[in-house]
Swiss-Prot record:
Any one of the GO CC terms: cytoplasm
Record-listed E.C. numbers: 3.5.4.19
Organism: Solibacter usitatus (strain Ellin6076)
Protein name per the record: Phosphoribosyl-AMP cyclohydrolase
InterPro entries linked to this entry: PRA-CH, PRib_AMP_CycHydrolase_dom, PRib_AMP_CycHydrolase_sf
Pfam family, one: PRA-CH
């Protein structure tokens, strides 16, 4: 049994979840090469759809994601990757999770506090 990379232009959706708290940290995409690299190295690696290249999460920030467990869905076209984050946050905007906004009365509002300064980590670019 193999993952189905053919359904979505060679990609599977990767839901990244904190293995201890269960909080969803981010969603990314993996092609076969990124998935293989993730399994081989134990660090979450993705396919950047905008840059069209492999992307080791935490490559520039140092906030890598250590893989603890990988599961797949019934259609074999998505993976759930449980990780231990090596840093204060996963989101490039300075938050623990990329899911820091919540819909409140029809408006998106920031619902979490920043966990680090992205300007200090990324040199002013976010």
């Amino acid at each position: 049994m193999n993952l189905d990379f053919a359904k979505s232009d060679g990609l599977v959706t990767a839901v990244i979840q904190d293995h201890a708290s269960g909080r969803v940290l981010m969603v990314g995409y993996m092609n076969q090469e990124a998935f293989n690299k993730t399994v081989e190295t134990g660090f979450a690696t993705f396919w950047s759809r905008s840059r069209k290249k492999l992307w080791l999460k935490g490559e520039s920030s140092g906030h890598r994601l250590v893989v603890k467990e990988i599961s797949t869905d019934c259609d074999l076209d998505a993976v759930l990757v449980k990780v231990e984050a090596q840093g204060p946050g996963v989101c490039h905007e300075g938050y623990e999770s990329c899911f820091f906004r919540r819909l409140d009365a029809g408006e998106w509002k920031v619902a979490d506090n920043p966990t680090y300064d992205p300007g200090a980590v990324y040199g002013g670019k976010s």
